[in-house]
Amino acid sequence: MTQFIKGQWVAGLGHAVTSKNPANNDVIWNSQTATPEQVNTAVEAAREVQFDWFMLGFEARLAIVEAYRAQLEENKAEIAETIAQETGKPQWETATEAGAMIGKIGLSVAAYNKRTGTSENDTPAGRAVLRHKPHGVVAVFGPYNFPGHLPNGHIVPALLAGNTVVFKPSELTPKVAELMLKLWEKAGLPAGVINLVQGEVETGKALASHPQIDGLFFTGSSRTGHILHQQYAGEPGKILALEMGGNNPLIIKGVKDSKAAVHDIIQSAYISSGQRCTCARRLYVEKGAEGDALLAQLTDAVKRIVVGAWNAQPQPFMGAMISETAAKGMVEAQRNLVNLGGHSLVELTHIEEGTGLVSPGLIDVSQVIELPDEEYFGPLLQVVRYTDFDEAIKLANNTRYGLSAGILADSRDDYEYFLARIRAGIVNWNKQITGASGAAPFGGVGASGNHRASAFYAADYCAYPVASVEADEVSLPANLSPGLSL
């Protein structure tokens, strides 16, 4: 019983699907997918209760969301372990994700009150009131890299605003989604307010194309996001929020503390085995002795990064990638870059057949004439040597994406020069570019999204504004308009 529809756990009626631990191939979850007919039932269930959920009022909805926060707190160890087993991420990292899920509740409440609450102003024409109303039934498509935190960042603000939800998680992390729904159930969420449909492409297509959904919130690949964007092109009445990936640049310029720089580069490129949408993919290092020394130090540090299973002791920095297929894809990406003229400084290797375990890679692509503008979603960092700062910024901007970017530089003037010219939604200075604040918006430009920033701005796409001019009774104006007599 792995589908949660109309408050009931039911079996999927589609084909069999299995989730395995990518570090050792242990079966984590095994069931059947939801059929298009079951997706339809889920959407109908969400539609049936949506108005009642909205009319319950914000305070009553908030009480249930707060009860969910209590469930997250009580079960954070189980959440962290489930994420670790299903994604292969090390336990220290999944504990951080479980904590972020808890923190998201307070941030979402603050965002709702600040960006989509109710306000009144007296005007000569009457009382001007701004309110916000939910879109209705929204679909949430979750990713595998943060299977708890990222869908949580759509679901919580959607519910606070009064929407009901049909949640389709990644087929690679179904157990995490199942655990989330069990916690919502324990929190006392009314039947039908969230419905869970587990499945692969067929399930996703049935949900995305359903005529009765009012919006879709997606986190995932640029390829899938573009398909959804094309699909919704003729439906302006539906809200579509896309958070996609990036070919993210990091520039190094004039840093005295090379050890700190190496640390921030590693945290930018290799955390989560490179499976964060904000991970650095391209590193720009100045030519010359200083750049040579930094690169040598980085090369040595990358070689010493510890890779291991999710539960290894002492804990590794990098766990497994999400699957063996993903791991082999990174080996192939490295091979392609070498064939184009790249030189491996640290070779990325597939550590163990049948698993997602890979070692981190570092490759100098300075001699590659036509560098592919691709998001290689794994622990492979491309190095480009430069001589001129403007040249480095131009190269950094030479991408169809625009999610995150950063510069490590001791000079604030260099940072401000970079900030004014770089094209990205997240721009960090002397910090890893995978670092983002939940109290700020999260999103990019270009192929990285469709101008629907999430995190603190998720409240914006979960409700629409309703502007009213009001008076307590009908009354004549002091002066009638010219040409009128009553």
UniProtKB/Swiss-Prot annotation:
GO biological process terms on file: arginine catabolic process to glutamate; arginine catabolic process to succinate
Catalytic activity: N-succinyl-L-glutamate 5-semialdehyde + NAD(+) + H2O = N-succinyl-L-glutamate + NADH + 2 H(+)
CDD domains linked to this entry: ALDH_SGSD_AstD
InterPro entries: Ald_DH/histidinol_DH, Ald_DH_C, Ald_DH_CS_CYS, Ald_DH_CS_GLU, Ald_DH_N, Aldehyde_DH_dom, SuccinylGlu_semiald_DH_AstD
Entry EC number(s): 1.2.1.71
Binding-site positions, NAD(+): G220, S221, S222, R223, T224, G225
PROSITE patterns: ALDEHYDE_DEHYDR_CYS, ALDEHYDE_DEHYDR_GLU
Gene3D superfamilies: Aldehyde Dehydrogenase, Chain A, domain 1, Aldehyde Dehydrogenase, Chain A, domain 2
Record bears the keyword Metal-binding: no
Signal peptide positions (record): none
Keywords: Arginine metabolism, NAD, Oxidoreductase
Active site positions: E243, C277
Gene Ontology molecular-function annotations: succinylglutamate-semialdehyde dehydrogenase activity
Domain of life of the source: Bacteria
UniProt-listed Pfam families: Aldedh
Associated pathway: Amino-acid degradation; L-arginine degradation via AST pathway; L-glutamate and succinate from L-arginine: step 4/5
Family: Belongs to the aldehyde dehydrogenase family. AstD subfamily.
Function: Catalyzes the NAD-dependent reduction of succinylglutamate semialdehyde into succinylglutamate.
NCBIfam families: arg_catab_astD (TIGR03240), PRK09457.1 (NF006992)
PANTHER family recorded: ALDEHYDE DEHYDROGENASE-RELATED
Protein name stated in the entry: N-succinylglutamate 5-semialdehyde dehydrogenase
Gene name, Swiss-Prot/TrEMBL: astD
